[in-house]
Amino acid sequence: MASSATMLSSVATAACAAPAQASMVAPFVGLKSASAFPVTQKTATGLSTLPSNGGRVQCMKVWPIVGLKKFETLSYLPTLSVESLLKQIEYLIRNGWVPCLEFSLEGFVSRDNNKSPGYYDGRYWTMWKLPMFGCTGAAQVVKEAAECKKEYPAAFIRVIGFDNVRQVQCVSFIVEKPE
């Protein structure tokens, strides 16, 4: 019993003699003063101080902000010629995507009916016939687009490349715009 009391008292004195943990590590005193760093200042001499890429860039307008709205893929290019359109559709078919034609009289997203997105805000277009499963040539798609244009002359018409395995739309571009 005496030995256990001696042991307890020796532990207590050891605990009191141990220094506080805060004094083992130096406390954070903040950042060094600014006077320790050398100061170099450039004098403003005009445009020569601005960053430059050697003057190779010329200013160009991206698109006119009035009267020419942009759509999806390829909308920043000029209107596709028939040859370019055929090449794009051949690319779509070559990748195994199913061509599908859609049309809309509105053509743009507008929130006239409600503040939240929905069916009637122009986001969803009407499908022209069924998706062209088994389509092997771009000429078939162009023929269907011309038929849709004949039926709805005031409509926007787009071609969609649909991947029926992953069930996603892979490409979409406008083929006809109203005049």
UniProtKB/Swiss-Prot annotation:
Pfam families recorded: RbcS (PF12338), RuBisCO_small (PF00101)
Provide the GO MF annotations for this entry. ribulose-bisphosphate carboxylase activity
Disulphide bonds annotated for this chain are none
- Where is this protein found? Plastid, Chloroplast
Gene Ontology biological process terms, A to Z: photorespiration; reductive pentose-phosphate cycle
Instruction: Tell me which UniProt keywords the record has, alphabetically.
Output: Calvin cycle, Carbon dioxide fixation, Chloroplast, Photorespiration, Photosynthesis, Plastid, Transit peptide
Q: What is its main location?
A: plastid
What's in the GO CC field? chloroplast
Report whether Transit peptide shows up as a keyword of the record.
Answer: yes
Q: Where is the transit peptide?
A: 1-58
Quote the Gene3D superfamilies the UniProt record gives: Ribulose bisphosphate carboxylase, small subunit (3.30.190.10)
SMART domains per the record? RuBisCO_small
Signal sequence segment:
none
Q: Which HAMAP family match?
A: RuBisCO_S_bact
The family assignment reads: Belongs to the RuBisCO small chain family.
Quote the subunit structure annotation: Heterohexadecamer of 8 large and 8 small subunits.
As a miscellaneous remark, the entry gives: The basic functional RuBisCO is composed of a large chain homodimer in a 'head-to-tail' conformation. In form I RuBisCO this homodimer is arranged in a barrel-like tetramer with the small subunits forming a tetrameric 'cap' on each end of the 'barrel'.
This chain's function reads:
RuBisCO catalyzes two reactions: the carboxylation of D-ribulose 1,5-bisphosphate, the primary event in carbon dioxide fixation, as well as the oxidative fragmentation of the pentose substrate. Both reactions occur simultaneously and in competition at the same active site. Although the small subunit is not catalytic it is essential for maximal activity.
Q: What is this protein called?
A: Ribulose bisphosphate carboxylase small subunit, chloroplastic 5
Provide the species name: Fritillaria agrestis
